[in-house]
């Protein structure tokens, strides 16, 4: 957890696979603008608890963590900002608990759409079968691939693979894995 400043509370939710450290450049500027800024590590990252049950990582759980954090900080309300996977947490926090989260901003992920199905179903129904979300659904497969060479995994996830098309990293070639 990183914290700086005094004033109304602003929570900064990092994305995947990042930590609160990702906000280190924004925290001083927001604090200097008159806010109390807190950037937590999200559930399962950094020094947080990491439940073994994948069912413990839902948006409801993550929103609950943010609500509990606001209360633990002695506050009743906060502005919530999320980047990447932190953005859906921020958007849903504001939707589910507008009494706590009075303002919301999402970076790189738009507000949740009201589609006809769940996101994974929508991808499949639109003929998309190789998005990284889908690859991560088979228990143990991505984990085994990532654990074979942790340094290479982090280099690729955080630094890219040199694709000329920046969106190419989101797709998995059949039989070749994510990396």
Identify the role of each PLM range.
Residues 45-81, 85-179:
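Flexible "cap/lid" subdomain of the alpha/beta-hydrolase fold that forms the substrate-access gate
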